[in-house]
């Protein structure tokens, strides 16, 4: 895609004229208004990283409201909230109570403390196969279907940390039992 000289900017995120109305609603542009650098950054952080990447990430490690297109991840405030029967019975509704997410954070911390060198490798995989791909692909605001599969490598890296959390928790429990503090 080639920009007119007056339209060149660093990090052009809102680029496809076919999606002008969607860009307008997300960024808050007026009709015919061109996005500024700050609005392009807002679109990248709010929509591309926030909605497109983090929502998919949290679907896998926190829970998912439903399998409807555009469904959000299941936040703690929604765990026990009464929802309509159609939503409650939706087979795509998953409530993990954020257990995998918390385990991943524990595993991340455990690996950082125990093995900083290999932590760097897994963290690099996590970033390069997640947020860096979001940055590189510059996806449009609408997709014909959910595209969470493009971030699968990032999810694998986070799954490593979930596994390491189990080892870390086991070590803590076994040291408590050995020292007779139970």
Can you annotate each of these PLM segments?
Residues 1-108:
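Lumenal/periplasmic acceptor-binding loop at the mouth of the active site in multi-pass
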Residues 115-116, 159-181:
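Membrane-interface junctions at the ends of membrane-embedded or membrane-associated helices
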Residues 90-93, 118, 135-152:
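Membrane-interface catalytic loops of GT-C/OST-like multi-pass glycosylation enzymes that act
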Residues 143-168:
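Hydrophobic/aromatic-rich transmembrane helices and adjacent perimembrane loops
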Residues 109-113:
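Hydrophobic alpha-helical transmembrane segments
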Residues 96-103, 114-137:
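Transmembrane alpha-helix segments characteristic
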């Amino acid at each position: 895609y080639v920009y007119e000289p007056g339209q060149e900017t660093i990090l052009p995120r809102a680029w496809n004229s076919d999606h002008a109305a969607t860009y307008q609603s997300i960024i808050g542009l007026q009709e015919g208004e061109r996005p500024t650098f700050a609005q392009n950054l807002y679109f990248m952080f709010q929509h591309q990283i926030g909605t497109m990447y983090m929502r998919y990430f949290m679907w896998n490690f926190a829970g998912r409201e439903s399998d409807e297109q555009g469904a959000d991840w299941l936040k703690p405030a929604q765990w026990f909230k009464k929802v309509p029967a159609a939503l409650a019975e939706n087979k795509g509704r998953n409530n993990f109570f954020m257990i995998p997410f918390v385990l991943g954070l524990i595993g991340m911390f455990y690996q950082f403390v125990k093995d900083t060198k290999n932590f760097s490798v897994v963290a690099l995989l996590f970033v390069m196969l997640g947020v860096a791909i979001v940055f590189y692909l510059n996806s449009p605001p609408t997709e014909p279907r959910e595209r969470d599969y493009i971030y699968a490598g990032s999810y694998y890296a986070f799954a490593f940390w979930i596994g390491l959390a189990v080892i870390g928790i086991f070590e803590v429990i076994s040291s408590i039992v050995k020292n007779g503090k139970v």
